[in-house]
């Protein structure tokens, strides 16, 4: 489909499952190889997908063109979110108020395509709309997921202990990749996005409470 964010989520998930030692790792490597080959074949045969998935990505990353050509819309969203955060560092401007505050500032009104309903990045949205209070809560969750993932890898390598079973690793992958900071996202306060964020959390807590996969 040419949806780069979704493709990146899939790739990151596969790599997470590979680096989290489990009995299915070799099968995941095989599936990842098949996925990359399949996408490459489709991209070669479809110039529109090829241009969006590869050429446009390389251009915006500054590899084939000046980094200044990075998506002006996204760059504008990020800069505005940062400005709003600096003016309201502790509590932000309020949930779902990015649009209102952006349109109320004259300097932003003169810049096309920069005022939108949210800044298209979870952490920048939390900083601008909820300040440090909301940001640190979610960022702590992200760091916690990183910590227990590293703990699993360490115990598996050093003591040959399986800290998490494969189903739990999949749930961890879902939570961690959803909170990955360096990728465009939907609005954090959107209902369906919150299902993606928090439904796996409920499953993880249930598994932990029942001691089914630990």
Per-region residue spans from a language model:
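Hydrophobic transmembrane alpha-helices and their immediate junctions
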Residues: 15-19, 24, 28, 108, ...
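Transmembrane alpha-helices of multi-pass inner-membrane enzymes
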Residues: 14, 141, 168-214
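Long extracytoplasmic/lumenal interhelical loops at the membrane interface
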Residues: 63-79, 83-87, 91-130
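Helix-loop-helix junctions and helix-breaking kinks within/between transmembrane helices
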Residues: 1-22, 45-47, 131-134
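A membrane-periplasm/extracellular boundary helix in multi-pass inner-membrane enzymes
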Residues: 1, 21-66, 77-87, 95
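Alpha-helical transmembrane segments
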Residues: 1, 5, 39-46, 138-142, ...
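Alpha-helical transmembrane segments and their membrane-interface exit regions
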Residues: 14-21, 38-39, 61, 199-205
């Amino acid at each position: 489909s040419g949806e780069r964010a979704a493709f990146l989520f899939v790739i990151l998930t596969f790599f997470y499952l590979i680096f989290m030692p489990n009995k299915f790792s070799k099968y995941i490597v095989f599936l990842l190889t098949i996925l990359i080959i399949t996408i490459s074949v489709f991209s070669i045969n479809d110039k529109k997908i090829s241009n969006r998935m590869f050429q446009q990505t390389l251009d915006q990353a500054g590899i084939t063109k000046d980094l200044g050509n990075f998506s002006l819309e996204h760059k504008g969203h990020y800069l505005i979110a940062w400005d709003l955060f600096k003016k309201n560092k502790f509590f932000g401007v309020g949930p779902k108020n990015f649009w209102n505050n952006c349109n109320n500032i004259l300097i932003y009104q003169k810049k096309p395509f920069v005022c939108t309903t949210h800044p298209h990045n979870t952490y920048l949205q939390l900083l601008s709309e909820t300040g440090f209070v909301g940001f640190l809560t979610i960022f702590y969750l992200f760091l916690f997921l990183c910590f227990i993932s590293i703990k699993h890898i360490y115990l598996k390598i050093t003591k040959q202990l399986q800290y998490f079973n494969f189903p739990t690793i999949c749930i961890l992958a879902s939570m961690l990749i959803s909170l990955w900071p360096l990728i465009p996202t939907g609005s954090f306060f959107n209902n369906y996005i919150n299902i993606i964020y928090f439904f796996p959390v409920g499953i993880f807590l249930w598994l932990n409470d029942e001691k089914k996969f630990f």
